[in-house]
């Protein structure tokens, strides 16, 4: 059961644009198909270069075994905290688009199936929401090492006033 922390030029990283948007979002990223490191880097760059995203900072990458269905490659996970001018529904649509852009099929073969890219919205400001397609904060974030480890490392590496 391998667990490992990876760092590179983009993970962890703090990037600030001159614009400072008001909506604060916490994301969990995961990938275990094709080239997970390349996919996570490309996802980070997509958010970084988006005109509606201001500050963005990422955790180190946490490599960990899958849960649920375990006969699959290890997951590469990271967290990203960003500021955006997009409202919740527009941001949710952007996440949906990015997942598809990176090859994620909307229909999974089965629960906990391998995937090229999974983006979970862990939190959006202080919104509490329970709908069929979205629950905030993410209902299982506090039970998953794939979120807790990167998020904890992120908090250690960056002072709150930096973001």
UniProtKB/Swiss-Prot annotation:
InterPro entries: Hppk, Hppk_sf. Pathway: Cofactor biosynthesis; tetrahydrofolate biosynthesis; 2-amino-4-hydroxy-6-hydroxymethyl-7,8-dihydropteridine diphosphate from 7,8-dihydroneopterin triphosphate: step 4/4. It comes from the Bacteria. GO terms for molecular function: 2-amino-4-hydroxy-6-hydroxymethyldihydropteridine diphosphokinase activity; ATP binding; kinase activity. It is an enzyme of class 2 (transferase). It holds the Pfam family HPPK. GO terms for biological process: folic acid biosynthetic process; tetrahydrofolate biosynthetic process. Keywords: ATP-binding, Folate biosynthesis, Kinase, Nucleotide-binding, Transferase. The keyword NAD does not apply. The keyword Zinc does not apply. PROSITE patterns: HPPK. Its EC number is 2.7.6.3. It catalyses: 6-hydroxymethyl-7,8-dihydropterin + ATP = (7,8-dihydropterin-6-yl)methyl diphosphate + AMP + H(+). Catalyzes the transfer of pyrophosphate from adenosine triphosphate (ATP) to 6-hydroxymethyl-7,8-dihydropterin, an enzymatic step in folate biosynthesis pathway. NCBIfam families: folK. Belongs to the HPPK family. This is 2-amino-4-hydroxy-6-hydroxymethyldihydropteridine pyrophosphokinase.
């Amino acid at each position: 059961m391998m667990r490992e922390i990876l760092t590179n030029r983009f993970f962890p990283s703090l990037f600030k644009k001159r614009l400072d948007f008001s909506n604060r979002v916490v994301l969990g990223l995961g990938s275990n198909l094709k080239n997970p490191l390349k996919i996570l880097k490309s996802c980070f760059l997509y958010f970084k270069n988006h005109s509606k995203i201001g500050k963005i900072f990422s955790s180190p990458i946490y490599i960990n075994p899958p849960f649920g269905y375990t006969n699959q490659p290890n997951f590469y996970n990271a967290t990203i905290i960003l500021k955006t001018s997009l409202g919740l529904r527009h941001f949710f649509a952007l996440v949906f688009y990015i997942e598809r852009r990176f090859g994620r099929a909307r229909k999974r073969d089965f629960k906990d199936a391998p995937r090229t890219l999974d983006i979970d919205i862990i939190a959006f400001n202080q919104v509490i929401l329970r709908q069929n397609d979205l629950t905030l904060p993410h209902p299982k974030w506090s039970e998953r090492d794939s979120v807790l480890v990167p998020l904890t490392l992120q908090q250690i590496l960056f002072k709150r006033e930096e973001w």
